[in-house]
Amino acid sequence: MAGRPLPGGGGVCAAAYPNTSAGFPPHLQAGAMRRRFWGVFNCLCAGAFGALAAASAKLAFGREVNVGFCVLGIIMMATTNSLMWTFFSRGLSLSMSSAIASVTVTFSNILNSAFLGFVLYGECQEVLWWGGVFLILCGLTLIHRELPPPRKPLPHKQR
C-alpha cells in the first residue's frame, strides 16, 4: 500500500479496497454482510440465553425444589440473563436496524423456549400455540418491515 498515493483530502476511494466491487451498494459489500451475519448470530444467541434464563427460573422456583437447586437456578438465571443482555446489545450494535434485532431475538426466544420446555419439562405445545407463535412473528415482521418509498404519480395523471 506504500506505493499508492492516498486520494486528496484523506477520503476513502474504491482503489483503497481492491477486492471490493465499487458497483455493489453499501449493504451488500463484504464488511456489511459480515456485520449483518454477526448481528443476526448475536441476536439468536440472545434469544437462546433468554430462554435458558426462563428455564433456570422455573428450576429455581419450582414446588418441589431443595435449597441447592434453588440457589443453582438463581445463579444460572442471573448468568444467562446477563449473557442475554450482552448478546442483545452486541446484536443491536451490529444489526442494520433495531427492528431486525428485536424480531430476531423474539423469534429465537420463542422457539428455544418451546424446545427447552419439551426437553427439560416434557411440555408439548399444541397446534393453537404454534398458530399463535406464527401470528406473533407475522405481526412483528409487518410492524418492523421497511416500506417502499411512495410512488410519484405519472405526468399524465397529475391533473
UniProtKB/Swiss-Prot annotation:
Disulfide bonds: none annotated. Keywords: Membrane, Transmembrane, Transmembrane helix. The chain crosses the membrane at residues 37-57, 68-88, 100-120, 124-144. One of its GO terms (cellular component) is membrane. It is a multi-pass membrane protein. It is found in: Membrane. InterPro entries: TMEM42. Its main location: membrane. PANTHER family: TRANSMEMBRANE PROTEIN 42. This is Transmembrane protein 42. It comes from Bos taurus.
